Amino acid sequence: MFRVGSWLYGKKPANASTQSLDSLVELRDPATLILNDDVDGAEDGLAEGTSSFHNLGRGVVAFIRATLGFEQDIMRQASERLNEAETTASVDQHRAQHNSQAPNTYHSAMYTPGTEFALCQAMAQLMGAVVGVLNESLTESIKGFYRLRKAYITLDAILKMEQKYLQESRMATPIESAAPGSIPLSMKRQGSSNLQSSSSSISSAKIKKAASSATTLAAPVENTDLSERLTGLNLSSETLAPGDVKEASTLGPADMLNHDPDSDIFHNQIDIFVHSGSNFCFGILLLLISMVPPAFSKLLSIIGFHGDKERGLRMLWQASKFHNLIGAIAAFSVLGYYNGFVRYCDIMPDSIPGQDEDVQGYPQERLELLLAKMRKQFPKSQLWVLEESRMCGANKNLDRALELLCGGESSPLKQVEALRLFERSLNAMYLHKYELCAASFLECFELNTWSRSLYYYITGSCHLSLYRNALDKDPAKAAEHAELAEKYFRLAPPLAGKKRFMARQLPFDVFVARKVAKWEARAKDWKVPLVDAVGVDPIEEMIFFWNGHSRMTDEHLLESLQKLAWCESSANKTWSREGPEEKAILKLLRAAVFRSLRKHSQAKDLLEDILSQDRNLFKGHLKDDWICPVAHFEMAANMWMERPTYIAIHGGSKEFTDPEATEPADSSKSLEYEREKVHKCKEYLEKAAKWESYELDARIGLKVTAAMEAVQKWENTHPPA
């Protein structure tokens, strides 16, 4: 362990490299326990250590708990631990630089002395930033952006060392490059000062000043846009030369280290820690920034953040190769991205089958190998069972996905168990297993406090579906489900707004409160029970918002069409009273199902009917103002899926009534046909991206951002002749 006093009082300095190695070795067992869901055991294993690595480990434990559960008390604990880890790492970094010439000190061929502690600082800052942004306090959210900026700069400096090492290794003679531990002179001269300046460039005084400013501004939280408060955080001029940040996110694979863990350059644990850690942290940062909705991405670029999805994914894949805690967390991030985000989005870059270099499609074989490796490495962890279930769902095997989450052991970690239950609830919803879905969401309510209004809302929606199913067959059963549906619908709105993200209400909380208020107003106006004032099946609406259609087989999709048909059936006594808004929702949901069934002409006909109407019909008090922008996105998705390239990978349309949907036989005409489809897709996306603020715009914005990036990539690889 480090003893700061021996350095402060001028005694013989300890060998920092040896102590770093000892601490990293000590952390192996606790790290394994974390990924085997034994967080309490990991806490015990970390309790005795006082090094920066042990402090960071304790911060990681709290961070995992905080981000899996979103509970405020755990977030506060994580923030405190991460602050402590950042402080001790800063002290140790300065000492490592001071003692860099001590006898027997290890000198990395890639990194300057103290880089491992700079990475510890950056990791603590990055995790602290995430906790801050997830915090309900606007002040903490703004502090989080400062920490994010500091971590960004430090990680960029570390990765520039790797780039410099690669460049100088290519120019070195075989004898020079074979010498272990040799450091290019230019790195010795420049690296240390660059790291030190980057890590201290944003002073704590500035953070305190921003926090104070944020506190002053925080009174009218509901009426103030966060973007207005962050526009003053443009820090690029203080820390990087113009263009440096942009340059950091535009490097190609040739500028990145992609060696395997058994490569000779990774013979030292310190180098392994720095390389895997910096690749994971910067990779996740670049990926997340690239995914944010259009309005927020503009704000991030103003204050100096630039995402790069492809580079971020390559870095995460690289980090996942390593057999340590960082490698496992990188693997979890990779699997979560592909099985969650990619399957949530409908317009993504085309996959290139059989190419490991392809990172923006869905590299199924590569993902299966990664998951198998993780399950073998951490056999007791329910996290990897959860990821296997997600992978099954992503590949349209929902029955197996649900089976994996219904049996077997539960996780001793409450937050993991809550995730498992939530995923089980969604899968049951996609499969129209209403009883299981309702029971599972009620279990989520007991385990997690994040979005309890949504849990009650979906539970009520399940009982509404059961009520409609039993209405003609079993009136007593129907009355029972009607009572439960009304109970949970009325319980949901008072819970909305209890949790906040960057001082704002959660999007689905706003949605739930408005929907129930709309139904209550209709019930009063029509003089009917609440359950008869609902309109289009809210479960089908939820399936759409969670993009369950992409996980459903044709059989499940046809069942959704049957559920939607109830609205227009004789069983629905209030359909004749419905206006254009509810009828547009029905058309939109049907169009989404038809698109997933690859019946694009039917989908487009329904969407064109919506878009031909006056947009003002869908605006106003208690109205579903999301209908038109979402219809534009759905049109874009149909255009994307009608391209010859998409058809070659995923199969063709299941209808042949639309002459435009027939792919030209001539290759040159085929490219022009595809270009036309991409152009139309882009036009619809631009309209959706530029739409005024609407309910759930952040959620839909994620899909729009990913789609615009996919279109841009297609245009870059297919320039006009």
Curated annotation (Swiss-Prot):
Role, per record: Inclusion body (IB) resident protein that interacts strongly with lipid droplet (LD) proteins. Involved in LD-mediated IB clearing after protein folding stress, probably by enabling access to the IBs of an LD-stored soluble sterol derivative that acts as a chaperone in inclusion clearing.
Major site of localization recorded for this protein: cytoplasm
Gene Ontology cellular-component terms listed: cytosol; mitochondrial outer membrane; nucleus
Family annotation (Pfam families): Iml2-TPR_39
Signal sequence annotation: none
Keywords: Cytoplasm, Nucleus, Phosphoprotein
Region of interest (Disordered), residue spans: 177-199
Location in the cell: Cytoplasm; Nucleus
Family statement: Belongs to the IML2 family.
Protein name: Inclusion body clearance protein iml2
Entries under InterPro entries matching the protein: Iml2/TPR_39
Record text on subunit structure and interactions: Interacts with lipid droplet proteins.
Lineage: Eukaryota, Fungi, Dikarya, Ascomycota, Pezizomycotina
